[in-house]
């Protein structure tokens, strides 16, 4: 979503 693109979310895994 747009909010995800705004902030660099760390790759969980």
From Swiss-Prot:
Claim: Zinc is one of the keywords in the record: no
Hydrolase found in the keyword field: no
Entry's localization field: Secreted
Extract one GO cellular component term from the record.
extracellular region
The entry's note on the tissues where this protein occurs is: Expressed by the skin dorsal glands.
The PTM Glycine amide maps to 13
Which keywords label this protein?
Amidation, Amphibian defense peptide, Secreted
Family, per entry: Belongs to the frog skin active peptide (FSAP) family. Peroniin subfamily.
- Which protein are we looking at? Peroniin-1.1b
Q: Which organism is it from?
A: Litoria peronii (Emerald spotted tree frog)
């Amino acid at each position: 979503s747009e909010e995800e693109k705004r902030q660099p979310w760390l790759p969980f895994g």
